């Protein structure tokens, strides 16, 4: 079951109040930035906000320049898990998964051009890899595009699989 994203203004009010309770200040632009980066998906925003809250000292201000560090902290904490998941994937699925991440929103993944661009086997092999990745919820289909389901896993791939 997918929940609708929260209203950005309501989340700003909530987060600002939580920071104020502990004598901390939150730059309001942070919430808008996180909503933009994570499409309003609360679980990702909350994980970053938890780190930002912990790293903001009492009487201090949480600023926009702290966001990337907080995201990287989350990526580093999950790195072993992502590495294990990637290693446990069958090779064809892993290669298709990495290709989808590289594209961001991968379209025409069953085409020969996509397979050639990412040095993948035949389009039929890509198709069977897609089925496995969809069944395991590593990817999702949004219209005519495939995307990595876990946004932190996607960011981790982009950071470490260059």
Name the predicted role of every residue range.
Residues 1-36, 57-60:
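Helix-loop-helix "sensor" segment of P-loop NTPases
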Residues 118-135, 143:
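Short amphipathic alpha-helical interaction segments
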Residues 144-151:
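Minor-groove-contacting beta-hairpin "wing" of winged helix-turn-helix DNA-binding domains
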Residues 7-8, 52, 153:
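Conserved nucleotide-binding/hydrolysis micro-motifs of P-loop NTPases
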């Amino acid at each position: 079951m997918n929940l609708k994203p929260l209203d950005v203004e309501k989340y700003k009010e909530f987060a600002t109040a939580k920071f104020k309770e502990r004598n901390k200040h939150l730059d309001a632009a942070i919430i808008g930035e996180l909503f933009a980066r994570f499409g309003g998906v609360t679980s990702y925003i909350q994980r970053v906000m938890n780190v930002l809250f912990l790293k903001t000292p009492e009487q201090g201000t949480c600023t926009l320049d702290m966001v990337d560090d907080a995201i990287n902290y989350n990526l580093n904490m999950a790195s072993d898990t992502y590495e294990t998941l990637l290693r446990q994937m069958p090779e064809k699925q892993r290669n298709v998964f990495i290709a989808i991440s590289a594209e961001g929103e991968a379209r025409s993944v069953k085409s020969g051009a996509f397979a050639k661009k990412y040095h993948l086997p035949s389009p039929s092999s890509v198709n069977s890899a897609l089925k496995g990745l969809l069944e395991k919820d590593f990817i999702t289909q949004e219209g005519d595009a495939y995307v990595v389901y876990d946004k932190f896993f996607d960011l981790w791939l982009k950071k470490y699989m260059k």
